């Protein structure tokens, strides 16, 4: 397979990624600001499918209407010239000081009303640009001090905000779905809806949960010490993997936003294996964009920025090649069977069997030899060794 990306790969980048100037809490920018039009053209040249943005990545927070219209006109022209898509749009409810205590969950009601109005206006923009997903990351929705929030009220306000936005989408007839992006902390000490599991539980309480799903990010789940592949698998199983953010992370620390695969490489391999091959026994598959949410190293100039963009796509394609070979290997299929992976796909109860039938089945309890069953070797290490050998292109 070719390692040159094409639009068929559906690789997308946030404007805030390649446009990150390198400013962080400890230092100022190391690169000049990037013109969004240049970003569109350069990403198109590199083989990307699309570009995404927060509203204020594209249009400054306090831009007058005339400036906003000019920026959008130039951006739309660049999209038309290149054919680059805008599959996802999101709203910045975290940078301006007005959002220091959150947007949807601020203790200040006037701020909540402003935040919700800002979101609704950007839903309109997302629809105008043909986006199919509207991501909500509540970076400031949380606290540092447990006594500073009525937690039930905060969740009520979060529900109110998401349901209002989802209801607006339905009322307008937009072809849009909302994807919530979990993160455990940073910038807040503790962020509401910190993991995929929290997000799924929250969605179950929504009035319009049918069009609300998740946008899990590699580093965010790994910051919480969780298995990213398990997280996206559960979201996919629940029919709620609406979007995905790929990057690299090395352990439980700050959000590193490394190039995809430059952190936990084995985890990245199994993530791509799931995205490209699906579950071993079949079931739902992800068909959305492969979105890179990372930060180019602040040690590099813009030559390094574009190299890092290419690196994300190359890493994914390399891992895709290895994952396809892994699943196609007859020895791997034999190892999967020997380890009972396919057996797990068989229902525990027989067709039509009741609990009374199960309790009456002596073979399942009275005559079951637990000691004998405990002797089974599942050979999981052998299976994983095969995966690593494929990952290293040693097979």
From Swiss-Prot:
One of its GO terms (molecular function) is xylose isomerase activity. Mg(2+) 1 binds at residues 181, 217, 245, 293. It is an enzyme of class 5 (isomerase). Mg(2+) 2 binds at residues 217, 220, 255, 257. Binds 2 magnesium ions per subunit. One of its GO terms (biological process) is D-xylose metabolic process. The keyword Cell wall biogenesis/degradation does not apply. The active site is at residues 54, 57. Gene3D superfamilies: Divalent-metal-dependent TIM barrel enzymes (3.20.20.150). SUPFAM superfamilies: Xylose isomerase-like (SSF51658). The keyword Protein biosynthesis does not apply. HAMAP family: Xylose_isom_A (MF_00455). This is Xylose isomerase. It comes from Pseudarthrobacter chlorophenolicus (strain ATCC 700700 / DSM 12829 / CIP 107037 / JCM 12360 / KCTC 9906 / NCIMB 13794 / A6) (Arthrobacter chlorophenolicus).
């Amino acid at each position: 397979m070719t390692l040159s990306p094409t639009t068929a790969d559906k690789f997308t980048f946030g404007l805030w990624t390649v446009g990150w100037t390198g400013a962080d809490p400890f230092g100022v920018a190391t690169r000049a600001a990037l013109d969004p039009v240049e970003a569109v053209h350069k990403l198109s040249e590199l083989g990307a499918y699309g570009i995404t943005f927060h509203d204020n990545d594209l249009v400054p927070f306090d831009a007058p209407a005339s400036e906003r219209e000019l920026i959008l006109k130039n951006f739309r022209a660049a999209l038309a010239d290149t054919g680059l898509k805008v599959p996802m749009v999101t709203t910045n409810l975290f940078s301006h000081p007005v959002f220091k205590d959150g947007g949807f969950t601020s203790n200040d009601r006037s701020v909540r009303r402003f935040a919700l109005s800002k979101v609704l206006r950007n839903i309109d923009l997302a629809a105008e640009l043909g986006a199919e997903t509207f991501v909500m990351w509540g970076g400031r929705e949380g606290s540092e001090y447990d006594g500073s929030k009525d937690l039930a009220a905060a969740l009520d306000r979060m529900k109110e905000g998401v349901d209002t936005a989802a209801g607006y989408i339905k009322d307008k007839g937009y072809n849009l779905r909302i994807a919530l992006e979990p993160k455990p902390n940073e910038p807040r000490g503790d962020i509401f809806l910190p993991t995929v599991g929290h997000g799924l539980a929250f969605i179950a309480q929504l009035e319009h949960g049918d069009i609300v799903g998740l946008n899990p990010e590699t580093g965010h789940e790994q910051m919480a010490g969780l298995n990213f592949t398990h997280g996206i698998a559960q979201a996919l199983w629940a029919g709620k993997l609406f979007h995905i953010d790929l990057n690299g992370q090395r352990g439980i620390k700050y959000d590193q936003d490394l190039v995809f695969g430059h952190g936990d490489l084995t985890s990245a391999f199994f993530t791509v294996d799931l995205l490209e091959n699906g579950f071993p026994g079949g079931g739902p598959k992800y068909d959305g964009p492969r979105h890179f949410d990372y930060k180019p190293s602040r040690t590099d100039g813009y030559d390094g920025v574009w190299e890092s963009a290419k690196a994300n796509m190359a890493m994914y394609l390399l891992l895709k090649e290895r994952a396809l070979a892994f699943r196609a290997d007859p020895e791997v299929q034999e190892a999967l069977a020997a380890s009972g992976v396919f057996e797990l796909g068989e229902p525990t109860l027989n067709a039509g069997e009741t609990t009374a039938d199960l309790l009456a089945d002596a073979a399942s309890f009275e005559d079951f030899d637990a000691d004998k069953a405990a002797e089974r070797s599942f050979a999981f290490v052998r299976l994983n060794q095969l995966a690593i050998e494929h990952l290293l292109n040693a097979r």
